[in-house]
Amino acid sequence: MAKERGLISPSDFAQLQKYMEYSTKKVSDVLKLFEDGEMAEYLQGDAIGYEGFQQFLKIYLEVDNVPDHLSQALFQSFQTGYYIEDTVREDVVCLSDVSCYFSLLEGGRPEDKLEFTFKLYDTDRNGILDSSEVDRIIIQMMRMAEYLDWDVSELRPILQEMMKEIDYDGSGSVSLAEWLRAGATTVPLLVLLGLEMTLKDNGQHMWRPKRFPRPVYCNLCESSIGLGKQGLSCNLCKYIVHDQCAMKALPCEVSTYAKSRKDIGVQSHVWVRGGCESGRCDRCQKKIRIYHSLVGLHCVWCHLEIHDDCLPAMGHECDCGLLRDHILPPSSIYPSVLASGQERKTSKISQKTMDDLSLSTSEALRIDPVSNTHPLLVFVNPKSGGKQGERVLWKFQYLLNPRQVFNLLKDGPEPGLRFFRDVPDYRILVCGGDGTVGWILESIDKANLPFVPPVAVLPLGTGNDLARCLRWGGGYEGQNLGKILKDLETSKVVHMDRWSVEVIPQQTEEKSDPVPFQIINNYFSIGVDASIAHRFHIMREKYPEKFNSRMKNKLWYFEFATSESIFSTCKKLEESLTVEICGKPLDLSNLSLEGIAVLNIPSTHGGSNLWGDTKRPHGDIHGINQALGATAKVITDPDILKTCVPDLSDKRLEVVGLEGAIEIGQIYTKLKNAGHRLAKCSEITFHTTKTLPMQIDGEPWMQTPCTIKITHRNQMPMLVGPPPRSSNFFGFLC
């Protein structure tokens, strides 16, 4: 049977990618062995035979035996013209084609992948794709769609129409320029041809080991998993099995997007047996006897729990339940190829330029959210807060559509931002520490989004000063995530100031540490607190095993603070620097300072308020001072500063002087209200004359003599949690 060049099956391609995930070899390493190494005997000019190709795969994939069907399919995909299977071992393939293909899979640019696939299907090498070559491309796309479980009965005419649209000049053939233009704008060619493979809903469960605090029953054999015994639970559908039953489990019921036009727009219930943790039916309000056998049903989208007998009364359509405002149901996500031709032409993606060519799986799907909802884009840093991050990740994968939840350790925030780029009225939830939040805000800056979404924070780990100021707390402690999502629905938007930091070093032989950030979200400081943080940072990098618990960290921090109070390494700081606020010098001559902090938010070091609470006495003078404090760009008058309240969005910074480590400790333990209020300003410049410790948002470094300019950069919409019943929060959040 003859087979055309390039038509490797999607399942073979998926298997190849799995091999590549575990391989540490690079194509360049293998090529050296063929060009002048032990594999040179297999080289015939620039070609290799089937045996040489098998050796290439064996070395590159680091496996002893590549399945014969896979190696033959790959070998045949690189052959020109037709072949007879009986004589496959006598044929050869071009080594440069093979190396180019695997290099692209390693991480080639999208435009390179597009150009390679064009040449792969241009079998007569005339620089255009004629009708027969386009037909072969459509065949491959159909096979890919079938592998992805799409409804292929409606797809062929859609693909034919799409391929006609690619022929922009109507010549009857497709040039390389037209192919690249289409791939860069409206058509997800790489996905449709199988070179991007994360679209597959493969029916596989996402298992995690779990010990059950109550009697549960295996979804497969229906026998009990003993109290306190370990079984496996699927993160996506809550299907539960014994360890030994996992291999025979039914496929996962969760499909994350619509695969047919008839499924777009209307979401159906997806019922899974068991998993009725509340023990009460949401239909009849009677008990579900979950302790006696595998009974009841739960919907993976609206999370309703019902008796088996109540199912006929439930209806077909699912409204996604209490969390509908946040959820993108599968009916709202569908392959962009299923959009009408006019929709593809007017797609916002088509406005992208060739310089921004980054079509990915996300852009192969279109999102049409349910009206009057605010879909939630969730970023999780699994490393934050010990194991908290991992638990939060799989909990959100169940509560929401898994395609809304992104693991930052895999590909960072960019895939999520691209996926949601054109979604109206969406929100972002960042699960991590202040550093993770800063990473997301910087990525939003770079993404040049048409709509900048408001950002909420689920704080993981310790510190979390920004989350404290935004009323999301100092750290997640296992609270009900559904309750947190309901709080998010009633949150308010505040536009938080962000500040640019420019460090201009003086000519000196001393070498400075790299500046950790160019943007301030929380605070900047010079002197004593930065010195303590820097010593802590250096010691933790040198001896990480000594910093493996919160209690140890606190003890080390206390030790460094104590030694700093004894040696006072930043004593008489005012002699080593000068400060200008909006071009005017700040007088420090009457003060003996060891540190200066510049605050954008009224929380540092895990909840310390260096600015202090603002008293609100009555009287005309107070009213005048308060009015001045709310409007002036520069304030240094002590009486007016007493009335100033920190504000995240007033485009001004608070400047505080610190006498030493003891004073910082007193503020931290609430024995002292605040440091010395020095100024409130919209721009500040430091000139230093010696090497000093500094920090931005908790990241310390040693800086040689320099000039530091801090200016307003922009504002970012942030979500403020609902007011607590009894609030001790400060400033405008009181």
Swiss-Prot record:
Stimulated by calcium and phosphatidylserine. SUPFAM superfamilies: Cysteine-rich domain (SSF57889), EF-hand (SSF47473), NAD kinase/diacylglycerol kinase-like (SSF111331). It is found in: Cytoplasm, Cytosol. Ca(2+) 2 binds at residues 167, 169, 171, 173, 178. Ca(2+) 1 binds at residues 122, 124, 126, 133. GO terms for cellular component: cytosol; plasma membrane. GO terms for biological process: diacylglycerol metabolic process; intracellular signal transduction; lipid phosphorylation; phosphatidic acid biosynthetic process; phospholipase C-activating G protein-coupled receptor signaling pathway. It comes from the Eukaryota. Its EC number is 2.7.1.107, 2.7.1.93. Pfam families: C1_1, DAG_kinase_N, DAGK_acc, DAGK_cat, EF-hand_7. Gene3D superfamilies: 2.60.200.40, 3.30.60.20, Diacylglycerol kinase alpha, EF-hand, Probable inorganic polyphosphate/atp-NAD kinase, domain 1. The modification N6-acetyllysine is found at residue 483. Residues 109-144, 154-189 form the EF-hand domain. It is an enzyme of class 2 (transferase). Keywords: Acetylation, ATP-binding, Calcium, Cytoplasm, Kinase, Lipid metabolism, Metal-binding, Nucleotide-binding, Repeat, Transferase, Zinc, Zinc-finger. It catalyses: a 1,2-diacyl-sn-glycerol + ATP = a 1,2-diacyl-sn-glycero-3-phosphate + ADP + H(+); a 1-O-alkyl-sn-glycerol + ATP = a 1-O-alkyl-sn-glycero-3-phosphate + ADP + H(+); 1-O-alkyl-2-acyl-sn-glycerol + ATP = 1-O-alkyl-2-acyl-sn-glycero-3-phosphate + ADP + H(+); 1,2-dihexadecanoyl-sn-glycerol + ATP = 1,2-dihexadecanoyl-sn-glycero-3-phosphate + ADP + H(+). Belongs to the eukaryotic diacylglycerol kinase family. PANTHER family: DIACYLGLYCEROL KINASE (PTHR11255), DIACYLGLYCEROL KINASE ALPHA (PTHR11255:SF38). Monomer. This is Diacylglycerol kinase alpha. It comes from Bos taurus.
